């Protein structure tokens, strides 16, 4: 394993192209300076990270809600806006208002949805498209077959990391949001390298985190890599508040 810093090693061999992207990300280079192949790969990483993080969060919610059948408890984290989108999704597959009002009809609808996984996946894709997600989001079988799936999905959509990934996907290629997309994409890409095993954190990282007030792990890793590789960041003070950032707070959420 190659040493990449005091706290980081290269666990899985990175290709020259992957290393080049990592160095550009660490420098904070403008996305406009990336080659088209690099941009396509970065966009793919964001799409895959959106799917991965969403499924991990849904799995967490499904474990928390195991055995729970109380609708008020299950819906405690689901924003009203999500219920409206779910209502529109139901209407798109031919569900009538009378079916949603009557208890017996709702029960039959629930059984019908949970016995037709393709229908649930289609409803999910409708919800994602309404939120501005254009790629096909694959829900893991263990998540979509959970009886509380729609509650679990609605609960995790306001999570901050999900919204940051959503921000990058919606505003990808938009000049006004480029600085923030670049900033968020850099963090997401480093997280991707950790999750895929390309980067391995050493035990000394924990000691460093404790001595620096437990600042973000990606900040420590990024600073360590930049220091070891002699990389100077290009990011200056171009991170200013823009109206588009309101997307991160549309659900008035406190979940992470």
Curated annotation (Swiss-Prot):
Cross-referenced InterPro entries: Herpes_UL79
A Pfam family it matches: Herpes_UL79
Family affiliation: Belongs to the herpesviridae UL79 family.
Protein name: Gene 18 protein
Organism: Saimiriine herpesvirus 2 (strain 11) (SaHV-2)
